[in-house]
Amino acid sequence: MVHNKKFMRAILSIIILLGISFCYSRSEKKDYALFLQEVIAKKNDYKRLYVNADVSAKDSIITVARAYLINTISNDIFPYWYGTKWDFNGTTRTPQQGKIACGYFVTTILEDVGFKIPRVKWAQSASEVFIKKLAPNNIKRFSNRPIAEIENYLLTTGDGLYVVGLDIHVGFIIVKNKSINFVHSNYYKPEIGVMKEDINSKNPFKDSNYRIIGKLMSDEMVLNWINNIAYD
């Protein structure tokens, strides 16, 4: 009976967190730094829940945390950055101020939400290096394949957040409700920079000969986030 009560308390806490988690995109836009503080506070909430949960509740916490991360990055974090200009040497940490290169855009987003990654090292490396670290068991490579084949792969693999490395570029992919969008700091349109666009539009994703795609937020990746596990 005591065990059941403990389990129900954990589940109730998860449900409460879930309700709070998905309110961000509907709330008035906050200062970016303040919003990131809320994200880190939420991460700490998940860690406290996870540490005190039994085995069955731990799985539920991972599921909820994954949904929170995907929703927060896709619907809250990205919009802060839309319109931040691109530059090959751009390293800004603040949306709408300065410029940002494609690699720095990807690694800055991940570090900002609380992943312990070597932001500068990864931003300056080939994207395949960190894609293999973030999604070691969820990677697919395409060489000189038609865009329709890649769209089919993404739709079959399912909704979620992906990172993609190209010939000379890197960015995120959002798959949701059969819609596929490429989010990146766009060197084709440097004055616009960070933007979201259909993968089948005129962009580096469509034009690239090589593509390596990793699906983010596996159980392992979510646990690394919750437990502050560092990547090298």
Where are these regions (language model features)?
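Low-complexity, Gly/Ser/Thr/Pro-rich intrinsically disordered linker/tail segments
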Residues: 180, 185-190, 194-232
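Charged/polar, solvent-exposed surface patches and flexible loops
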Residues: 48, 67, 71, 75, ...
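Residue-level marker of positions within ordered structural domains that often coincide
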Residues: 21, 111, 176
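Bacterial Sec-dependent N-terminal signal peptides
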Residues: 1-28
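Residue-level detector of intrinsically disordered/flexible regions characterized by low predicted structural confidence
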Residues: 6-11, 177, 198-199
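N-terminal capping segments
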Residues: 26-123
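...with weaker cross-activation on analogous glycine-rich loops/strands in unrelated enzymes
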Residues: 124-194
